[in-house]
Amino acid sequence: MDAIHLGMSSAPLVKHTNGVGLKAHRPRVMSKSGHSNVRIDKVDGIYLLYLQDLWTTVIDMKWRYKLTLFAATFVMTWFLFGVVYYAIAFIHGDLQLGESNSNHTPCIMKVDSLTGAFLFSLESQTTIGYGVRSITEECPHAIFLLVAQLVITTLIEIFITGTFLAKIARPKKRAETIKFSHCAVISKQNGKLCLVIQVANMRKSLLIQCQLSGKLLQTHVTKEGERILLNQATVKFHVDSSSESPFLILPMTFYHVLDETSPLRDLTPQNLKEKEFELVVLLNATVESTSAVCQSRTSYIPEEIYWGFEFVPVVSLSKNGKYVADFSQFEQIRKSPDCTFYCADSEKQKLEEQYRQEDQRERELRSLLLQQSNV
């Protein structure tokens, strides 16, 4: 049976038809790579909130902004303390050029200009110690300033080192090595109609305590007539009988049964592409090497769900008895050999669709009557 390859660039995100009938689909809440598309706007004091949680703010910065900020911080501390050293030398009379006084002891040796004060600040903070410029016992406030500079800059260096290590050690990069199938399929598994996705761990190091869950996001109208733009419904996935903590050592398929309790129970081959929803899939796991908790995310819209297809097997057994995961087959799907579930009687499907439409009209009528009674 021929397989269809659905790569990241070739898989259709939105199918268009020529002529009349074009429909604008709702924007994605989450991208395929797991990044949020929600824009936070018009928050009072948002910059103050970021400053109050400075640790998280700095860690979340992009590397180019982080490096620029830290380089500017070091240069500013060198310059600011250098200006203060220069002011101390000026007040003490160490900058009076042309007057030689053997009895005059400067606060800082060899600091007779702003450049010299800047170099002394840099050498003191970085503990270079060339030996030309040094502080004397003449000015206690200069000694106090030197101690304050070393304490403050040490705290800054600790903060910088901590944020660098925390950003490097974040499990975010580990989550990027978890691969989701670009599309989802609906097929029969053990006699039940299921929504199926594939997940793979791209590293040899294992992920422990894996938990995969889903959230269905769609517009919902309550009985009171309130319209919820993003109503969340839980979508449960399982792998065979290991629904609690699957062993993700090989690429695995996760199933969601489309039964009476499923929020996707109304899907049919006819209305699948007409639906407006987004299925967000989340995989939470613990990294074996660091014990850090990571989360990998993706989302599926109706145009990325294929009815009557199944995934091409990825895992095979080599000649020398080893399991082999062929990722060239990971994005390939093929027509399911069991066509009974999508070749059902058309009259039955029309009748079911008619019942659903009548039920929807009754709910809208009840909500309208309730609104009129409240008025």
From Swiss-Prot:
Cytoplasmic topological domain ranges are 1-60, 166-375
Question: From the record, which residues define motif Selectivity filter?
Answer: 127-132
What name does UniProt use for this protein?
ATP-sensitive inward rectifier potassium channel 15
The reactions it catalyses are: K(+)(in) = K(+)(out)
Record's keyword terms, sorted: Cell membrane, Ion channel, Ion transport, Membrane, Potassium, Potassium transport, Transmembrane, Transmembrane helix, Transport, Voltage-gated channel
Q: Which SUPFAM superfamilies match?
A: E set domains (SSF81296), Voltage-gated potassium channels (SSF81324)
Gene3D superfamilies of this UniProt entry? 1.10.287.70, G protein-activated inward rectifier potassium channel 1
- Look up keyword Membrane and say if it applies: yes
Q: Known Pfam families for this protein?
A: IRK, IRK_C
- BP-aspect Gene Ontology terms: potassium ion transport
Which InterPro entries does the record match to this protein?
Ig_E-set (IPR014756), IRK_C (IPR041647), K_chnl_inward-rec_Kir (IPR016449), K_chnl_inward-rec_Kir1.3 (IPR003270), K_chnl_inward-rec_Kir_cyto (IPR013518), Kir_TM (IPR040445)
Q: Report the main location listed first in the record.
A: membrane
> Subcellular location, in the record's words?
Membrane; Cell membrane
- Which GO MF term does the entry hold, naming one? inward rectifier potassium channel activity
**Tissue distribution of the protein:** Expressed in the proximal segment of the nephron.
Q: Name one GO cellular component term.
A: plasma membrane
Record lineage: Eukaryota, Metazoa, Chordata, Craniata, Vertebrata
Name the source's superkingdom. Eukaryota
Q: Which residues lie within the membrane without crossing it?
A: 114-130
What this chain does, per the entry, is described as: Inward rectifier potassium channels are characterized by a greater tendency to allow potassium to flow into the cell rather than out of it. Their voltage dependence is regulated by the concentration of extracellular potassium; as external potassium is raised, the voltage range of the channel opening shifts to more positive voltages. The inward rectification is mainly due to the blockage of outward current by internal magnesium.
- Extracellular compartment spans: 88-113, 131-139
Q: Write down the membrane topology.
A: Multi-pass membrane protein
The annotated site for Role in the control of polyamine-mediated channel gating and in the blocking by intracellular magnesium falls at E157
Oligomeric state and partners? Can form heteromultimeric channels with Kir5.1/KCNJ16. Interacts with PATJ.
* Activity modulation notes: Channel activity is regulated by variations of cytosolic pH; reversibly inhibited by acidic pH values. Inhibited by Ba(2+) and Cs(+) in a voltage-dependent manner.
